[in-house]
Amino acid sequence: MKNTFRISLKAGEKIYVNGAVIKVDRKVSLEFLNDVQFLLQQHVLQPEDANTPLRQLYFIVQVMLMGPEGADKTRPLLKDMLDNLLATFRNERILAGLKHVDSLVCEGQIYEALKAIRALYPIEEEILSAGRQQEQAIFAKAVGE
């Protein structure tokens, strides 16, 4: 971050800053004056919600941001996941996005990597939805509907 960055939080909201969890008891505005890794509560993905390939990738990167002390242990898992996704997806926008995520993580821009992954969710949903429709059509044909 090159400039200051201001965010507003509502009473009871949490923010994760450089691995620390901060909960506010009233509406506040925070201004970050230097580089900081943070994640708003609304962007935290719960383990049970990591139910698609990109959400699983997001969860891995999120762990790196929320627990920076364990980031080195998480990197091999991230590399394996990225390699698998790059080998599996055929959509050019997803592939370009995954390569961008990889470069952002390598540059230490973890929050930006999370934003880039979230931006790929709609494309992934289109792909998964088309796959589900195809499966349903095959099943219907097989059972004579």
Swiss-Prot record:
Disulfide linkage: none
Function according to Swiss-Prot or TrEMBL: Has a post-transcriptional repressor function in flagellum biogenesis. Associates with the 5'-UTR of fljK mRNA and promotes its degradation.
Source organism superkingdom: Bacteria
Protein name: Probable flagellum biosynthesis repressor protein FlbT
Gene Ontology molecular functions: mRNA 5'-UTR binding
Family, as annotated: Belongs to the FlbT family.
BP-aspect Gene Ontology terms: bacterial-type flagellum organization; mRNA catabolic process; negative regulation of bacterial-type flagellum assembly
Name of one Pfam family that matches: FlbT
Keywords: Bacterial flagellum biogenesis, Repressor, RNA-binding
